[in-house]
Amino acid sequence: MTPLMVLVLGPTASGKTSLGIALAQQLDCRVLSIDSRQLYAGMDIGTAKPTRDEQQQARHELLNLSTPDQPINLQQFCSHAQTLIEQEQQRGRPALLVGGSGLYLQALSQGLQPPALPPQTGLRQQLQQLGQSCCHQLLSQADPQAAAKIEPNDPVRTQRALEVLYGTGQTISSQQGRCPPACRVLELGLNPSDLKERIEQRTASLYARGLVAETETLSRRYGADLPLLQTIGYGEALAVLAGRLSESEAQALTSRRTWLFAKRQRTWFRNRHQPLWLNTESALEEALEAIAAARS
C-alpha cells in the first residue's frame, strides 16, 4: 500500500483542530500540528494551541519544540516533521498534518527543500537592531522574489531570508529546491462561510482566557521586543499593557488583523494547493470517505 499523507488545511478559526482530533481518533494516528507559532512553549493562548483536554483526546506532535527566544527555521521544522511522518507511515497509518501555516505545509507536501543553514545568532541580533522596516527593504533589494512572499511585518521570515543570503552568499529563493515526497498526498480543506464570526468568537475567547496575562509573562521573560510578541494577538496585548489600547480596542484590532490574515491564507491555499473542500456540517464523514478512497 502506498503511504498516505493527509493534510487538513484552512484559514485560522476554520475548525481544523476539532476535525484533526476526530480524524486521529478514527484513524488511530497522531495529529502533526503544522503551525509556526505553536512550536514555542509558553505561547498557548495567543496561538490557540490545542488545550490540555484536546491533547488528551488525541496525541499531538510538533508543539512546544523550543522557547520563543530560540527561533526554529523551516529546515529545522521539516526535519522534525519528516521523522514523525515516516514513523506514522512505517506503522501503516496515514500521516495526519493539521494546520494553517502555508509555507510549512507546502514544504512537507510538495517537497520544498529549504537551505540547511543553522541560525546565525550574531547576525540576527544585528538585524533586530536595524528594525523590521529596514530589514524588509534590504530583502526587497537583494531578493525581490523572497520579499514578495514575506509580509512586511513578519520579522522571523525576513531575518531568516537575510540570514541565508549573508550566510551563504546566495538568495534563499535560489536555494529552495524540490523533492516530492514518496507518498500519496490527500488535501482536505475547511473554509466555512461564517469564518468572520468564528474569528470574532475565538478572539473574544482568547482575551477571556488570559491573553494579556500570558503576554505579560512572555514579555517579562524574553523582553517586549521579542519578534514573536509582535505577531497577531500578542502585539495588541502588549499595547494594552503599555496603556496604548483598552482591552476592548485590542480585541477589535486582533479580530481585524486575524480576518485579514485569514483572507491571505485562503488565497495561498487556492493558489498553491488543490484541496477537496469539505462541507463544514459533514466534514468528518466527507474526510473519512476521501481517505478511504485514497487508501484503496
Swiss-Prot record:
Gene3D superfamilies: 1.10.20.140, P-loop containing nucleotide triphosphate hydrolases. Its cofactor is Mg(2+). InterPro entries: Dimethylallyltransferase, IPT, P-loop_NTPase. SUPFAM superfamilies: P-loop containing nucleoside triphosphate hydrolases. ATP binds at G10, P11, T12, A13, S14, G15, K16, T17. It holds the Pfam family IPPT. Its EC number is 2.5.1.75. Signal peptide: none annotated. One of its GO terms (molecular function) is ATP binding. Substrate binds at T12, A13, S14, G15, K16, T17. It comes from the Bacteria. Keywords: ATP-binding, Magnesium, Nucleotide-binding, Transferase, tRNA processing. One of its GO terms (biological process) is tRNA modification. Residues 35-38 are annotated as: Interaction with substrate tRNA. Monomer. Belongs to the IPP transferase family. Catalyzes the transfer of a dimethylallyl group onto the adenine at position 37 in tRNAs that read codons beginning with uridine, leading to the formation of N6-(dimethylallyl)adenosine (i(6)A). This is tRNA dimethylallyltransferase. The gene is miaA.
